Amino acid sequence: SEMCIRDSPHGKKWCDGGRENFSQRNKRTDMYIPIIRYADVLLIFAEAENEANGPTAAAYDAVNQLRVRAGLDNLSGLSKETFRQAIQKEWTLETTHERIYRFNLVRWGTYLTVMKEYFQKNFPEKVKNVTEERLYFPCPEHDSLINPNL
C-alpha cells in the first residue's frame, strides 16, 4: 500500500527516503505503516467501556480529553444509548477524511441505513448499490488458502 507524503516535516517522518522509488518529484513509499493515534485509543476505550459497563467515569474521561482539546464542553450524565451516540459523533468528527467512517458504520450496524439515506437524498439512482452483499470485503485469497474455514 502506498502512502502519499506531503512536503511538510510532519509528513516526511513516514517516508523511507533511502528507497529506490523515492524521489523529490514522487514522494511516495511502498512501506505499509499502520497508524493508530492516541485519539483512536481513547475512543476505542470509551466505546468498549460504555458497551460493557455503561457511561463510567473512565469512559467520560477518555471522550472528554478529546473534547477539551477541541475546545468543547465535557460530557456527563448521559444514558448508555445517548453516550453511545455521543461517542459515535466523536469518532465521526475526530476521524474526518481518514477513510474509516465506513468501517465504523459497519461495526455499529448502521451502514446500510445511513448509506441508503445518503444515496437516496444525493444519488437516488445509485441507492440500489447499497446492499448487504457489499457490506463486507472478501477475505484475501492468501488468507483463504491458509485457513479454508474463512
Where are these regions (language model features)?
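Flexible, polar/acidic helix-loop-strand segments at domain edges
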Residues: 1, 6-37
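Long, intrinsically disordered, low-complexity segments
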Residues: 28, 32-33, 67, 76-150
